[in-house]
């Protein structure tokens, strides 16, 4: 089976061992907490003994060969064991012959040579020679091993293993954790016993321990440390081989795997939290926090101060198990909001697997199974299926909090390796696209059309620059498992018969009109001192040479370069014929500009792909081609890659020496990218689409002439939106949600009493009925009947009204409609008169109509769709009339319905009325002409006063804008326009005492904007004297709107708002509010001078603005100025 898809290959970094510091910090990090007091003390003790541990390791390392030699001499006989130890250099050894006569070589052959330590003096040497007692209890069955029989190969392996044992001990001493010894020693006994003796190895390890301790006789602390780790070494070697961790699967579509125990021992310790009734309160809180971290991927209590206190108390008290606690957390509204509502069902399944089972989906069949469950039953059904599964019971049971079963915890599957590692990341909820089902489905599909090393290595096939997809946004890291012999599908830019795969001899042929334009240099004047290139011409044309140079720049760089970036020397050499086009391309590709643009910023794979497309005119075919260039780049760099492409046989056959490279092949994605762009569609070859009227337009077209009454009837038909917006409150059996019960009770109060009666609840009038309904002792129907029997209902809807009105209200409250006819009114009137209100309500609630429409558990509501047509207007009027609005009876009798077409709307009568109105508009020539001309009109036939007066105000005002780069004269025009607008200078000549020279200077220098200039002028002292002090606040507001917004106040609400602002905070605050308003920003922004906006104003505000503009400002020297200026108590 060939693999055609991959979910990505996340780099796996399995932990090979544990250290004290890393294990302690990792455990605190997994629990999202700070280090505890005990952990800090343990770390402090470890770091305090760091120098001692390094000293021990260094001393053991220096004497490692002597220690190993003692252990080897203890178990091997008949030769020199140390001769088989592979070591970098020969140590300095002191040897003494036991037999005394022969030389060293002969002694080694006879096995009469032993090694002694080189430190400790003469007494230590003697102790080493004559000490034949074992350093520990000799295991039964131990027999020394003869070197000659054991063989050189086995001896080398055994000496290597003894050296490794000592090395593992030194590693563990430095790390502060014996985990290194456990991982590398446990289970070796069975392996060693296949070629050697396990008892002999134990004796050798005991000798290693004794030899190591001999160096620390005067240091009890160091001796204790060495003894501790050596004991672990011996104990772990004696221990039996642990069994592998099996991962059994219930179905055949899932992989059954096993994990060696040493991988589990080396992995990071992942604490497992179990909820027991005997735990302390602190320990129970830790277990609950672990459940939150697993289900919500964060400690919601600490991060967001959220918790589900009801469930917490139940699981702490033992009312529910941890399994049930996990189930309810996964069904909570918080979980639905975080992990259900924002995602599609496939992604919800993946996240639920991670939270509840601690893994990702294993197969496509498993995803399909749970997809069917969530589609039919929603999130609750999915949660129930996962929590009730046999796998959950096997791994977690009733008391254990689920945990992530990732790398090191159990064997990982290969077919979902990448998605599962991504699913365990903290960023998993931020990925919306489902990964597992996408990967599983891709296994059955052909290879995708993408780069063999990932779709992110394909640049956009456009002219300008190297633009690669941004891999941090909607990442698509899934590589395509291309083989070394797989080629990508490329589309030839030219005739298909000239494809180089099927027709290699056609590489040099031009693509013609089906491909890009080809630039070929054929105007060289000659060559100097060398033979001319094949096909070179002696014709010379400066313009065509420059065209070739420009085309080369565009092809190599993707754009034209700046003048200072051009290679002038190479251009001159090309024009003089000293170099060919190929050499010119080579020089451009090796330039610093090309390196900075397309080599330095990118990964090597992306850079190779882009350079290959630019220089050879096509994308790379596959892994084999990419690997070749990648190897060259890693060994020799960019220049070697460029030379390899330009000196290739394909380049020579395609472009030769004098042709500028061009785009020969595109990927299908590149072709689609270019064809789907609107700008690339040629108008002369576009298909002429026939304009066809859609069928629904034809069916909706009016074919007859309709009268006005008919049109009005069609417009007004139907009912209001209230029919669609009706909400039905119904109690669901078996659910005791207090919030839902409370909402249902409130709906019942609003239906029966037509208001929310929260004040009456405080008097406990209905508390008994509410508690019974909440406990399920009564139904909603009985609750409604009880409300109708209450004293409050009798007081509000029975005592003040006659029987007919009581009947109307009763059918409205209990049946959701008005009485159908007079017969129904007579029926209920007789019940009211003979048996009273309770019998009347009982008859309504227990009627067949009530049981069919509302049943036992539904609150009555207004029944729009089921009412008879004749009764609909009565119900509409009854519901739209407020309670106690009047005492009128809505249905005194059923009047006949009036005709929908009024007599004056008939075509004949309407035409006659229109003719009479037209005659009335005609001028009466029997009267004098001046009477007709002086008549006023209110129907638009006469000339408006506005047309004749102030017509200049209706013209669009000139707009002044301060932009960058304008001259001083234009700036002065802008400044004058500001003064004329804000200070209302009629003549256009701004007096000098109005000007603020410091503001003028700042505006010219660009230190302030036009908006700031307007703000300061409107808040200045001259504005205050002209428009603020002499006038009342309402008039000041009118001035401010006209000067700063170019219009009059639109509504009384605006006037009241700014009137309060003026009275409380003064002129400055009002100016700030107007200048900083959204309306000012929308119309004028920062650099536009305010102007009168008369033509663009709404009709309702237009006349007010014209009137305000016509009101001249009364100057102090004018005869129209007020005789007494009403000042204000103080300027704010």
UniProtKB/Swiss-Prot annotation:
Assembly with partners or alone: Heterodimer of ApcF (a variant beta-allophycocyanin). Phycobilisomes of this organism are composed of a two cylinder core, from which six rods radiate. The core is mainly composed of allophycocyanin alpha and beta chains and of minor components.
CDD domains noted in UniProt: PBP_PBS-LCM
Post-translational modification: Contains one covalently linked bilin chromophore. This protein autochromophorylates.
Chief place where the protein resides: membrane
Species this protein is from: Nostoc sp. (strain PCC 7120 / SAG 25.82 / UTEX 2576)
Annotated EC: 4.-.-.-
Gene3D superfamilies per record: Phycobilisome linker domain, Phycocyanins
A biological process term (GO) from this entry: photosynthesis
GO CC field: phycobilisome; plasma membrane-derived thylakoid membrane
Name of this chain's protein: Phycobiliprotein ApcE
Its membrane topology: Peripheral membrane protein
Pfam families recorded: PBS_linker_poly, Phycobilisome
Location of the PBS-linker domain: 253-433, 514-692, 709-887, 940-1121
Keywords noted in UniProt: Antenna complex, Bile pigment, Chromophore, Electron transport, Lyase, Membrane, Photosynthesis, Phycobilisome, Repeat, Thylakoid, Transport
Record-listed (2R,3E)-phycocyanobilin binding positions: 196
Role: This protein is postulated to act both as terminal energy acceptor (by its phycobilin-like domains) and as a linker polypeptide (by its repeats and arms) that stabilizes the phycobilisome core architecture. Has intrinsic bilin lyase activity.
Source taxon at top rank: Bacteria
């Amino acid at each position: 089976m060939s693999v055609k898809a991959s979910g990505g290959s996340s780099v796996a970094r399995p932990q090979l061992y544990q250290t004290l510091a890393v294990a302690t910090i990792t455990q605190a990090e997994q629990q999202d907490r700070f280090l505890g007091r005990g952990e800090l003390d343990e770390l402090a003790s470890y770091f305090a003994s760091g120098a001692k541990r390094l000293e021990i390791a260094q001393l053991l390392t220096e004497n490692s060969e002597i220690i190993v030699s003692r252990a080897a001499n203890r178990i091997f006989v008949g030769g020199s064991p140390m001769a088989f130890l592979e070591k970098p250099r020969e140590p300095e050894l002191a040897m003494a012959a036991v037999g005394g006569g022969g030389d060293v070589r002969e002694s080694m052959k006879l096995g009469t040579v032993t090694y002694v330590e080189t430190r400790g003096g003469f007494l230590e040497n003697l102790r080493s020679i004559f000490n034949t007692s074992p350093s520990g209890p000799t295991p039964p069955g131990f027999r020394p091993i003869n070197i000659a029989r054991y063989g050189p190969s086995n001896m080398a392996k055994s000496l290597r293993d003894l050296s490794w044992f000592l090395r593992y001990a030194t590693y563990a001493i430095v790390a502060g954790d014996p985990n290194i010894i456990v991982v590398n020693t446990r289970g070796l006994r069975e392996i060693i016993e296949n070629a050697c003796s396990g008892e002999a190895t134990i004796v050798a390890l005991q000798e290693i321990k004794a030899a190591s301790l001999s160096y620390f006789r005067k240091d009890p602390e160091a001796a204790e440390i060495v003894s501790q780790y050596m004991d672990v070494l011996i104990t772990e070697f004696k221990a039996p081989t642990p069994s592998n961790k099996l991962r059994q699967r219930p179905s055949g579509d899932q992989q059954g795997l096993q994990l060696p125990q040493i991988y589990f021992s080396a992995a990071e310790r992942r604490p497992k939290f179990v909820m027991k009734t005997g735990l302390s309160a602190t320990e129970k809180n830790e277990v609950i926090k672990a459940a939150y971290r697993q289900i919500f991927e964060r400690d919601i209590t600490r991060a967001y101060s959220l918790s589900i206190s009801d469930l917490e108390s139940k699981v702490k008290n033992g009312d529910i198990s941890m399994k049930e606690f996990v189930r309810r957390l996964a069904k909570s509204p918080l979980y639905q909001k975080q992990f259900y509502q924002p995602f599609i069902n496939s992604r919800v399944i993946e996240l639920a697997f991670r939270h509840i089972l601690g893994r990702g989906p294993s197969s496509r069949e498993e995803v399909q199974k749970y997809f069917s469950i969530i589609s039919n039953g929603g999130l609750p059904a999915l949660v129930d299926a996962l929590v009730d599964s046999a796998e959950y019971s096997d791994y977690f049971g009733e008391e254990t909090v689920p945990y992530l079963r990732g790398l090191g915890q159990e064997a990982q599957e290969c077919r979902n390796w990448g998605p599962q590692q991504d699913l365990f990341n903290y960023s998993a909820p931020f990925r919306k696209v489902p990964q597992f089902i996408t990967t599983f489905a891709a296994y059955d599909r052909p290879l995708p059309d993408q780069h063999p090393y990932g779709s992110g290595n394909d640049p956009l096939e456009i002219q300008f620059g190297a633009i690669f997809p941004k891999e941090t946004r909607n990442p698509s890291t899934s590589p395509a498992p291309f083989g070394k012999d797989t080629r990508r599908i490329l589309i030839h830019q030219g005739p298909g018969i000239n494809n180089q795969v099927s027709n290699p001899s056609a590489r040099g042929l031009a693509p013609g009109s089906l491909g890009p334009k080809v630039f070929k240099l054929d105007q060289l004047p000659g060559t100097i001192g060398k033979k001319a290139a094949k096909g070179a011409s002696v014709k010379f044309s400066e313009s065509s040479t420059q065209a070739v140079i420009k085309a080369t720049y565009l092809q190599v760089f993707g754009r034209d370069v700046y003048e200072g970036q051009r290679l002038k020397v190479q251009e001159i050499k090309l024009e003089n014929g000293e170099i060919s086009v190929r050499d010119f391309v080579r020089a451009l590709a090796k330039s610093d500009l090309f390196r900075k643009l397309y080599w330095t910023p990118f990964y090597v794979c992306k850079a190779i792909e882009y350079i290959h497309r630019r220089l050879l005119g096509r994308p790379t075919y596959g892994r084999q081609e990419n690997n070749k260039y990648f190897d060259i780049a890693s060994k020799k760099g960019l220049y070697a890659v460029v030379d390899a492409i330009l000196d290739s046989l394909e380049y020579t056959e395609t472009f030769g020496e004098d042709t500028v490279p061009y785009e020969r092949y595109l990927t299908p994605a590149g072709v689609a990218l270019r064809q789907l762009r609107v700008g690339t569609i040629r108008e002369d070859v576009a298909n002429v689409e026939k304009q066809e009227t859609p069928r629904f337009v034809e069916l909706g077209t009016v074919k007859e002439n309709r009268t006005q009454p008919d049109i009005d009837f069609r417009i007004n038909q139907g009912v209001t939106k209230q029919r669609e917006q009706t909400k039905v409150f119904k109690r669901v059996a078996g659910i005791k949600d207090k919030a839902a019960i409370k909402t249902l009770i409130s709906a019942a109060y609003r239906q029966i009493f037509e208001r929310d009666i929260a004040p009456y609840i405080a008097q406990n009038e209905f508390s008994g009925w509410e508690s019974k309904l909440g406990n399920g002792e009564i139904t909603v129907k009985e609750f409604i009947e009880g409300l109708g029997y209450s004293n409050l209902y009798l007081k509000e809807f029975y005592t003040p009204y006659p029987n007919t009105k009581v009947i109307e209200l009763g059918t409205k409250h209990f049946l959701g409609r008005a009485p159908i006819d007079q017969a129904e009114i007579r029926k209920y009137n007789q019940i009211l008169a003979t048996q009273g209100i309770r019998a009347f309500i009982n008859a309504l609630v227990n009627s067949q109509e009530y049981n069919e429409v509302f049943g036992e558990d539904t609150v009555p509501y207004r029944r729009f769709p089921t009412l008879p047509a004749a009764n609909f207007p009565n119900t509409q009027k009854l519901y739209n009339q407020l309670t106690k609005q009047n005492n009128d009876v809505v249905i005194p009798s059923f009047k006949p319905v009036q005709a929908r077409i009024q007599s004056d709307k008939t075509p004949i009568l309407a035409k006659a009325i229109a003719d009479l109105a037209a005659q009335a508009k005609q001028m009466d020539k029997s009267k004098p002409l001046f009477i007709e001309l002086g008549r006023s009109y209110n129907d638009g036939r006469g000339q408006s006063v506005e047309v004749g007066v102030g017509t200049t105000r209706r013209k669009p005002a000139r707009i002044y804008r301060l932009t960058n780069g304008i001259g001083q004269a234009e700036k002065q025009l802008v400044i004058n326009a500001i003064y004329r607008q804000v200070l209302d200078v009629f003549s256009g000549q701004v007096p000098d005492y109005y000007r603020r020279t410091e503001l003028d200077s700042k505006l010219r220098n660009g230190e302030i904007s036009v908006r700031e200039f307007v703000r300061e002028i409107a808040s200045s002292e001259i504005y205050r004297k002209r428009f603020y002090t002499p006038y009342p606040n309402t008039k000041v507001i009118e001035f401010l709107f006209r000067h700063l917004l170019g219009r009059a106040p639109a509504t009384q609400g605006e006037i009241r708002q700014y009137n309060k602002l003026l009275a409380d905070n003064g002129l400055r605050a009002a100016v700030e509010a107007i200048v900083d308003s959204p309306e000012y920003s929308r119309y004028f922004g920062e650099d536009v001078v305010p102007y009168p906006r008369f033509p663009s104003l709404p009709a309702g505000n237009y006349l007010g603005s014209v009137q305000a503009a016509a009101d001249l400002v009364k100057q102090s020297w004018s005869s129209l100025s007020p005789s007494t200026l009403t000042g204000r108590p103080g300027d704010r």
